[in-house]
Amino acid sequence: MANFVRKLWEARLIENYNEVSVLGLMTTAPASMTAEAIVFNKLATGAIKDYEGNIDWSDVDTVPVTMLFDFKKYFADKVGDIEAAQTNIELIDAFAAAQMAQMSELVDTYAYAKFAAGAGTKVADKAITAAEDMYDAIVDLGVEMGKKKVPVSNRYVVIGWDALGMLEKDKRFTHNPDVLANGIVNGQKINGMTIVVSANAPANTILGIHKGAVGFGTQINELEGMRLQNAFADGVRGLTVAGAVVLNADGVAATTYTIQ
């Protein structure tokens, strides 16, 4: 369709996705992406050595980690008159917000499941019998990450809404916390980890992540406007692809819990 302004629709879709997804903030961005694959650079550094009068140089290089996109979802919707819609930015925004809210839920579920499966530290199931137990479980997870020498900065912990509810009953945590649109619990950290709440986190799981330990990327591969053959309307369809990978298993920790 000649009058379809792809850049306009794509920009609104991407902006609305970024407003509701935290993955881009808490993961390593890809070095490059093609239509079919995604590439991350993993840094390989030299060892620290004893000085005995001579210098032995080590190579510092990046090791590419390449994977095919294994998340692929599309939307295909009637929008009436595309040309008229393109003169109404509020209409396009409403469309983009609705589509990306659904897409972000699917992408988040996919990525968190991959991170949890690839966690290098898996703590035994925790029995939560009192509000304080949830806070303590998160502290313990952070301790395990510390034992693996995971950097203190850029640590996140992903929890479900039931876990956040337990935290709110704990005197050590803020009551009625401010949850941002992307799931970050504003201004709240436990054991140095920024709290992220998501309905798409693995069930009954506390997931600790260091930004440098996981990679994630997503893009809209196809976005088209067309006149529908079986309806008196125009249509817009798009294909979203994504890839998520654990780059350093030591930087990811997970524990399951049972609320009793």
Model-predicted segments: where are they?
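Sequence-level detector for tyrosine residue identity
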Residues: 17, 51, 74, 110-112, ...
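Glycine-rich loop at the start of a catalytic domain that most often binds anionic cofactors/ligands
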Residues: 53-55
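Alpha-helical scaffold segments that mediate packing/assembly in large oligomeric complexes
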Residues: 82-148, 255-260
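Extended, solvent-exposed, turn-rich assembly/linker loops in the middle of proteins
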Residues: 119-188
